């Protein structure tokens, strides 16, 4: 698995933990890495990318959540599963604040996170919502 995919997975786990318990970003990331099988061989690029994602989502969370609310049809943020909500946050952060990551990559990676961590409807839900957000943001 590549460094960025690993970083995204750890970022998702850390964001999930930050919603569940009082923890700092560093504590949540450490917990995510410790729980992972490959914790003995942490790729420095994956660690850095995960930290950038979590810190970015946390600092832009209000804006990101507004985009989720605006583009989710008949779903309130608080009714979404924690996994779906945080996958969407990661995807939107990449779409809006990481111009170095192509739209297709951001959406596909978020869909994969939905498949791997969410329920059977997560990937389609994530794909549809992120596509609407990308169009609204004029992300090529």
UniProtKB/Swiss-Prot annotation:
Pfam families on file: NusB
GO molecular function: RNA binding
Superkingdom of this protein's organism: Bacteria
Keyword Amino-acid biosynthesis in annotation: no
A GO term from the CC aspect: cytosol
Keywords for the protein's UniProt record, in alphabetical order: RNA-binding, Transcription, Transcription antitermination, Transcription regulation
One GO BP: DNA-templated transcription termination
PANTHER family documented for this protein: ANTITERMINATION NUSB DOMAIN-CONTAINING PROTEIN, N UTILIZATION SUBSTANCE PROTEIN B-RELATED
Stated role: Involved in transcription antitermination. Required for transcription of ribosomal RNA (rRNA) genes. Binds specifically to the boxA antiterminator sequence of the ribosomal RNA (rrn) operons.
Similarity-based family: Belongs to the NusB family.
The protein's name: Transcription antitermination protein NusB
């Amino acid at each position: 698995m590549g460094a960025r995919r690993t970083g995204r997975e750890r970022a998702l786990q850390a964001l999930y933990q930050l919603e569940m318990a009082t923890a700092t970003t560093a504590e949540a990331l450490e917990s995510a890495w410790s729980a992972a099988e490959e914790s003995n061989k942490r790729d420095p690029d994956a660690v850095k990318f995960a930290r950038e994602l979590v810190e970015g989502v946390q600092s832009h969370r209000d804006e990101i959540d507004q985009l989720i609310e605006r583009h989710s049809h008949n779903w309130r943020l608080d009714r979404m599963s924690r996994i779906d909500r945080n996958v969407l946050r990661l995807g939107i952060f990449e779409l809006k604040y990481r111009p170095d990551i192509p739209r297709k990559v951001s959406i596909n990676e978020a869909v994969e996170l939905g498949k791997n961590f969410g329920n059977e409807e997560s990937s389609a839900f994530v794909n549809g919502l992120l596509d609407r957000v990308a169009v609204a943001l004029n992300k090529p």
